[in-house]
């Protein structure tokens, strides 16, 4: 929808924060407070820690059968097809701080279920570490 010529997002029914009660008793949120729009990870305290990620953590080593030819070209150029990656589109458009992104390494987790890409089962924190500690193009200070 548009408001005064500017595109706006739909408004949520409920705004969540890190203290919000979630429907799973062992779930909590980690918010990236510097990104616009906000981004969050859902952390499940089981099986060594499971992170459910939106746009921030991705694991797409190669295109899937569901990507069109044009999507494959565009996404490859943007840096999407990499294993254990911090979402390049998210970094470029949401502009989180590098410290906020790197704070993921303070979490206890073994697995990542990304909304973009394949599940990372076992050793996920160590697998994402190089991307989280490396250059984060699009972050602000």
Name every feature range the model reports, one short phrase each.
Residues 62-141:
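Cap/insert and terminal regions of metallo-dependent hydrolase folds
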Residues 1-4:
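Short internal beta-strands
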Residues 7-75, 96-107:
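Catalytic core of the metallo-beta-lactamase
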């Amino acid at each position: 929808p548009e408001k005064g010529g500017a595109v706006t997002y739909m408004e949520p029914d409920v705004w969540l924060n890190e203290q919000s009660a979630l429907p799973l008793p062992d779930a909590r949120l980690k918010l990236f407070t510097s990104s616009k729009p906000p981004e969050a990870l859902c952390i499940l305290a089981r099986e060594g820690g499971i992170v459910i990620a939106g746009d921030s953590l991705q694991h797409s080593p190669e295109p899937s059968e569901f990507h069109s030819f044009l999507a494959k070209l565009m996404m490859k150029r943007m840096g999407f097809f990499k294993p254990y990656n911090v979402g390049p589109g998210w970094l470029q458009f949401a502009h989180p701080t590098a410290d906020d992104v790197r704070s993921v390494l303070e979490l206890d987790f073994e697995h990542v279920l990304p909304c973009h890409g394949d599940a990372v089962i076992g050793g996920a924190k160590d697998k994402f570490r190089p991307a989280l500690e490396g250059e984060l193009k699009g972050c602000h200070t």
